């Protein structure tokens, strides 16, 4: 055996890691995963481990700040590792690999010297894995027994020798072999990088030592600090609301403990607050079932969108006092789940499902489901989804399985379900028919090489091959073209258009197949496009959907040339037994050899690809079970036409009619093992008077709830005794959409007459994406009408489809699929990379999504919280429009949460501990103008939300709430009433206005939080629980069951006050703009407001205190035009009624400001010239809309007025100089 020399230098050793990883791994995917973990250890763990441990060991100097930051970074990286290890014993596979060795060595020193027991409690999965590793024989042999850190080691000072070693690292390797020139160069580069890094750190440290005034920290950074809720609270018990609120909003603090309490209190159950669900509720019933997500994995942002909308609606209806049920569930996802488990078995055990057999394989799927299935429910709870978990259903549960069986048997007995041999979408890799929704349409612009499972080389698509058929008994030939040349082996006709004069002489003629001993008729059919190619088309009825219809019309032969695995059959050698795409090459070459090949050229086309297996989908003739849909489709279309079923937005109705009016029968059988096995049996009768049945003969098929029932049916049908009947149950399972189609009533107990079914069926609403309008929604409607005689719901609301910030559909292969919890708790870039290891992506495909993740999230996805995520999704959803959601924009709504938090904290301090709210909401008695204005704005927000909820206008809801809290309550009202509270403190006789303000402020907080509660359940609950109650003994215990503000109750709109304050805020904004222009950030100036009439002067006088406070002015002086303002003022127009003159004399450098005004004057003159030129054009009046003309005229007038004011200001400045 050859001796392997290992250099003592790490850089030489690293080059061997990939070879070792490849040598000792079971397959390519594991090799790739090992290499990724090696990269993780080398690039993420080792540097930060050294940064923490080396100063403690005296190997480097100690900078406490840097060392503290490094420790925080170490914990962050280890938490990523902890998350990845949650479902694993070892990092790759089920045994120790090089990945475990490398990563364990990277964390060895932290575990020995840094990570105390409290740290290890946080890192339970990492600690479990590390202790498992170090106790393996391979580790014990080299490391011996490792003791874990009990208390972090004290700092050791560096010796002079060690200092020298740090400066001259070459000295550390004197005992090793001499280094090469390349190694010395590499180490020199490393030293250079280290020096630059140290210089950078020194610069950062110097900056931190500078006075705060030179660079003020941004408040946004402080807002993102993580604050946790650490008060021990047993699950289900109410959270502590007595302790003071933290200084800033933190999702981890706010979202802790509330959900288990909501659940335990039963707030999400329809029974809450009433004796029984059966009692009449005058406010009505709201019922909605969740579109059951697939059990195969995790929710993505698309699921988060639908759940944010559904939960917002559910909470709104619940707060309106309706009997409310939102029913959870999970779909067994037949093909998707089977594929995942099959890959898992092959990856981990090298076993296929056929090796195990059907029964054992099903056990493995159930085992996987029980381990992984709850993750989706966990995610839904983290999103705050107020589902009644006691009613949760899984489509393979006994209750739902019984309903599926009953539905099949009833429809089969009626003849609605039947068996037939037709073309289906076939996946050769899965050996199963698949539904249209599982077929991806891969659009090609021309010649393209695509990977196909089972083929080493990529296969050519996107080309059109032309070849000739010889006319029998003639030298003439007919040229046809095809994109699938291999299918010509199954051709049974050549079709031309009946009106095509070029081929009239071929009526009744045949052409000769070059490889098969058969003559092919020339048929005339209207479907042929005379203008395409030669106007002649090859017909392969058994392998093309259009050709199938032609074959039926002309009674052609249906020759199947492919078996279930994609091998060529029913043809002569040499093609017999070839793989389909190998046959493609062979047929092409054979045509060339016979001089019947004409040309090959690029051809734009759509290639059907199986979304599960990535195989090319083949149309294949297979015996399958079908549902007859013509009658049910007509009923479903009529329901929408007659207004009994409403589709929102209504432009989807046309799509509905197109599908329903042209519906085809539905193939419901799948050649899988996981799913609802079809309860149908093939009958064999042991009686000479009964001839043997054929597979396609429906007379020899019977369905039954049990074999005994099926046998009795068969015996009765053939008039023989049951003992002469032998049954063979169908091997296939039902399409997943079949069980999903009866979901609205099967979850309520159908076919049994349960109380839930009587109360909650039909449901109120279905909310889902428009992409499954036909696959799921239509089938629920059809099956609901067929089996219950009722529509399953009254309305269908289609939300948008979530795309990434670049408008791309979210896809694992693109790396842009985001787990909603990543937005909720935040995740580092390496965590996103680690998630890719858990997908079914080929190892070679992982690098592309990694690059996408690095480009979109160069550092991390910041922690935003559930409330911000929900609000963002609702804010950006618009009827009929997809969402291009930039995850970073969610961060803006996290800042909104912080603004909300600070506003309530300020208000609570202002209200004081002794504040007692009035029994009723305020009426117009003692309220000031500011009070009446904010109550008017609150009333407007209530009305806007009420109207928008009823029309599913979620952007209008979020806009109304956001504007009220941020721009009206925080920016205006809270600022304008501060002087009232200050005056009350200084003068006890002014307490009454302050008391009225407090009542108004309380009303705004309490009603504003209730407005927001359906969208942001966690932060509103946290803040609501801190508010005093109007009626402490009778008010609801939680904000989620308080009444939603009603427009009829909160009717405080005051148009006069709104109009006045709107004018005042225009003045304030103008003053603020001037202050900003002249950099008067901390200096209050006198403002002279020139008014055009006495009414405006009076208005300014009335609101002078508010203007002064909100604009941070020294004094507000109203002037009646033409009374001039003093010299030395900056001028800006607030409106056509008021001009702002802000005194700058003595506050700014006039010599610098005059050039600014000259620049503004030039811009205005150009603008006026451009507008004047536009308006003076001869065809302006005829071509430009009247509204635009009015806008242009107004712009011109305002620009001319502003120019005059600028000139006036320049004159004033000239006088000041």
Curated annotation (Swiss-Prot):
It holds the Pfam family Anticodon_1. Residues 27-155 form the GST C-terminal domain. A motif ('HIGH' region) lies at residues 293-303. Its EC number is 6.1.1.9. GO terms for biological process: valyl-tRNA aminoacylation. GO terms for cellular component: cytosol. It catalyses: tRNA(Val) + L-valine + ATP = L-valyl-tRNA(Val) + AMP + diphosphate. A motif ('KMSKS' region) lies at residues 809-813. InterPro entries: aa-tRNA-synth_I_CS, aa-tRNA-synth_Ia, Anticodon_Ia_Val, Glutathione-S-Trfase_C-like, Glutathione-S-Trfase_C_sf, GST_C, M/V/L/I-tRNA-synth_anticd-bd, Rossmann-like_a/b/a_fold. ATP binds at residue 812. It is an enzyme of class 6 (ligase). Belongs to the class-I aminoacyl-tRNA synthetase family. NCBIfam families: PRK05729.1 (NF004349), valS (TIGR00422). This is Valine--tRNA ligase. It comes from Takifugu rubripes (Japanese pufferfish).
